[in-house]
Amino acid sequence: VGSEMCIRDSSLSTSDHSRLEDILDELNSWAETDHVSLSLPSLRVDNFSQSLVEKTTKVRKSGLTFAAEAGTQRLRDVINKNVTWDQIERGCRIAFAEGYTSVKLYFMMGLPTETLEDIKGIADTAQQVVDLYYSMEHPKGKGVQVTISVACFVPKPDTPFQFCAQDRRESLREKQKYLLSCVHSRKIKVNYHDSTTSFLEGVFAKGDRRLAPVILEAYKRGCYFDGWEECFKYDTW
């Protein structure tokens, strides 16, 4: 009695599904009665709508994550992510109008042709979202929390950037420090992916079947749940 469950979709590009809203309608036919909330993963802002918000907030408001991808329009164009600030603003405006007081913005760091200006653009984008929130009417005392979530770019085979160099761990750490120095609001929180884990991911992405014995040996030496920072044993790897 009084308990609540959450169905969370963790797939990629969920909002691309042609019948997503029909699926949400079907789930909501019983979810609200059974106190089950629905949550979606990182969303493309160009596919985000007020209708989508309404269908995922019937029990409670779960987190919203928008894939902003890069800090500047120049870099978003380089990686062929057709996301504009106008679309980001529209998505956040819809969310704030529906009562959301926190959003997460997903970015990548270490992208080809990236400069410090692009890193600064990540902080600038988050600040613009904060400013957008306070430009709208809200109940007194309601504040906003914008979380920047930054992953490290890893070149993958059979992609346009497969032959691009991956940023060195030292370079990524410097960029992460620079990003933190560009954030000046307590309304903005920064989370970033561990560069050492990304280095291993790059090794696995470029490797072949000859890596299988390495992975098995690491397992035998106690490397379990390496996606969790507290369990990651880089020295063992």
What does each model-identified segment do?
Residues 2-7:
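Short, small-residue-biased leader/transition segments that mark boundaries at the very start
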Residues 176, 185-237:
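Radical SAM enzyme core and accessory elements
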Residues 15-147, 155-175:
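Conserved AdoMet/S-adenosylmethionine-binding subsite of the radical SAM
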Residues 9-12, 151:
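Glycine-rich beta-strand-to-loop/alpha-helix junction loops that act as flexible
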Residues 8-9, 35-39, 103, 146, ...:
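Acidic/polar loop patches that form or flank catalytic/metal-binding clefts of enzymes
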